[in-house]
Amino acid sequence: MGKKSVLWIAAGVILLGAAAWGPIVSNVEQPKYETVETADNIEIRDYAPMIVAETDVSGERRTAIGEGFRTIAGYIFGNNLSSLKVPMTAAVTQQASEKIAMTAPVTQQGDGETWHVRFVMPANYTTDTLPKPNNPAVKIKEIAAKRFAVIRFSGWAGDESLKRRTEELDAFIKSKNLKPLSAPTYAYYNPPWTLPFFRRNEIMIEIAR
């Protein structure tokens, strides 16, 4: 309960402008979930099991997000050991690198000093079929099915905004007599250059079923 987490939604951030971002995000694979309840800008969601690529990063939250993103993006874009076909070629080799489709979300959990940054892997992969990371800092993990209370908002997701929205979500959880099981997870769906009113941000707290 003492740990904080950040969820960074990553979806094709290379060479994309803010104007083009909306349609692209809608076509990016995201973890499967069912909406159990909706109350204005808050939802209760049941998420299916998922596989993530994770790396640990020390430091301030924003700095750690950037470093962790770059580390796992390297794995996504080919810094891995694969026995599968390399896209755009016909070769099959143990030393070939494989590009993995970008998905949403990427998660980051931490205690304020160390953050565990996670990319969600495409659903068509298993832990056996995913290429192995070349970088030992990247780990592949399975995440069990979970239920979350989620609040959605636009604008800049600065510390004060995150604090205020977290308090709003906490109040909702208490009003429903729900049992929180985790600290907040911050979800970002847009690249840094996206205009505030185009941004989609979420805060997620795991709750008991």
Q: How would you describe each model-predicted region?
A:
Residues 2-209:
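A solvent-exposed interaction/effector surface
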